[in-house]
Structures are given as structure tokens and as C-alpha cells.
UniProtKB/Swiss-Prot annotation:
It comes from Malus domestica. Belongs to the ATPase C chain family. PROSITE patterns: ATPASE_C (PS00605). It is a multi-pass membrane protein. The lineage of its organism: Eukaryota, Viridiplantae, Streptophyta, Embryophyta, Tracheophyta. This is ATP synthase subunit 9, mitochondrial. The record marks E57 as: Reversibly protonated during proton transport. InterPro entries: ATP_synth_F0_csu (IPR000454), ATP_synth_F0_csu_DDCD_BS (IPR020537), ATP_synth_F0_csu_sf (IPR038662), ATPase_proteolipid_c-like_dom (IPR002379), F/V-ATP_Csub_sf (IPR035921).
Length: 82
């Protein structure tokens, strides 16, 4: 039962990567729209888009880290109690 809960928790933690992919798509979609509306601010908009991409990707990097922590912590706890 604990193994099943561990797998469900790790899977739920990695679903966040789908949300990050949607967020990155929104960042660059907004960049394309802003450059189409005002081409003179393309350089500044690109800098903001790269910052948004980096912050979104940083959040996405927490998902595999949490999945790893969930699987390793539950593995060590189950060994101690048995």
C-alpha cells in the first residue's frame, strides 16, 4: 500500500512539468504578440521573456526534485519501520 501511495505522489509531482510547458508557451506567445504590436520594444520584451522563461523553468525543476524526495523518503521510512 505504501508503494502505491509513493508512486501516486511521485506521479502527481511530475505533472507540474505539464503546467510549466503551458507557462513557457504563454511567455513566448505573449512575446510574439507584443513584438507584433510594438516592434520598437522588441529588445526589451525579449529580455522580459527570457526572465519569465527562467522563472517558469525554475518552478518546473522543482517537480522532479519533489518526486525524487517522495520516493527516497518513503523508501527510507518503510525500511526503518519494518
Amino acid at each position: 500500500m505504501l508503494e502505491g501511495a509513493k508512486s501516486i505522489g511521485a506521479g502527481a509531482a511530475t505533472i507540474a512539468s505539464a503546467g510549466a510547458a503551458i507557462g513557457i508557451g504563454n511567455v513566448f506567445s505573449s512575446l510574439i504578440h507584443s513584438v507584433a504590436r510594438n516592434p520598437s520594444l522588441a529588445k526589451q520584451s525579449f529580455g522580459y521573456a527570457i526572465l519569465g522563461f527562467a522563472l517558469t523553468e525554475a518552478i518546473a525543476s522543482f517537480a522532479p526534485m519533489m518526486a525524487f524526495l517522495i520516493s527516497s523518503v518513503f523508501r527510507s521510512v518503510s525500511r526503518v519501520t519494518i
